[in-house]
Amino acid sequence: MDSTLSPRPVSLRGLTIGLLDNTKPNATMLLEEIAKELQEHHGAGEARLYTKEYFGTPVAERLLEQIVDECDIVITAVGDCGSCSAATVADGIMFERAGVPTVSITSDSFLMSGQAMATVQGFPGFDFYAVQHPVASLSADEIRERALTALPEVLRILGVEG
């Protein structure tokens, strides 16, 4: 299996961001807060929100193809349970293999689940971000704090440290 990252962008200027929401509570808010920072402070272009059918399985092929066609980079969140953290990491690997730089976000309580899925997918060194647990029960202000904390790692994983 291919464990090569897709080519990294030189900058985010004008790039379309795909946000893949896995339907877990606060996933949309976390993704949108990160996208807002990438747009306002790093020149990223439009952010497009997509929603998976079910959090516990990898993204459907049809939706994967749509996002690959429409976006330059992808951020997917939030893996804050066993099956959804594994699926979030699997999604990131699928996008990388399709040629789209991706950041998968799990919670730190499920870091090992994400790492195990990366190994199962033949990509044991796959780099993803583990946000502080919990996510689902947080207020909007707390989600914003989590997004700001995640930002340097999101940039690093995308290869455009800012």
Set out the residue ranges of the language-model regions:
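Short N-terminal or domain-adjacent regulatory/targeting segments
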Residues: M1-R13
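Glycine-rich phosphate/diphosphate-binding loop of Rossmann-like nucleotide-binding domains
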Residues: V10, L15-K36, G45
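Short beta-strand elements in bilobed, periplasmic/extracellular small-molecule ligand-binding domains
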Residues: E40-E53, G125-Q132
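Structural motif
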Residues: Y54-E65, I143-R144
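Short, well-structured alpha-helical segments in soluble
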Residues: A60-D72, D91
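Short, acidic/small-residue loops that bind anionic groups at enzyme active sites
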Residues: V89-M112, Y129
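A charged, well-structured terminal subsegment
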Residues: V131-G162
